[in-house]
Amino acid sequence: MYNINIQEITIIRNRKPAMKDVNQELQWFGGSLGLFNLRDRDKSCFRIFVEMVKSARERQALSSDELAARASLSRGTVIHHLQKLMKAGIIVHERNTYILRVDNMRSLIDEIEKDLDRTLSDLRDVAGQIDRELYN
């Protein structure tokens, strides 16, 4: 497990896919985390995300060049999406390679939940401090 600070994550509540197709479920999963949008017409971020999930299962970190080859994308496109995935706290950069933050999807959600809990706790503390200053 890696220690990271999530800078930005979006949670979107969507209907779960009716079919039990792993690609649809991965698309829904990543979409619910705000990773994919309409601008990603060729599903490049999704393709990179899938490769990162596969590499996590194999416990193998990948370079941007390896990801570009696996996903049939330019290195520039890969790096753009890797930065987005890092900013969301989904992947980490380690020794010129990238890897999913944890080795499975459930653990990823557990880690994001812990990050959100810490952030909400900080917000609650500051809100209490603001209330005391405003109302005393």
Describe the predicted segments one by one.
Residues 1-39:
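N-terminal leader segment of winged-helix/HTH proteins
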Residues 40-45, 63, 96-117:
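Short, cationic-aromatic polyanion-contact patches
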Residues 40-60:
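Short helix->loop/beta-hairpin flanking segments within DNA-binding domains
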Residues 61-71:
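A short alpha-helical element within helix-turn-helix/winged-helix DNA-binding domains
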Residues 67, 78-88:
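Basic amphipathic alpha-helical segments that dock to polyanions
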Residues 86-97:
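A short, conserved structural fragment
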Residues 107-136:
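Amphipathic alpha-helical dimerization/coiled-coil segments
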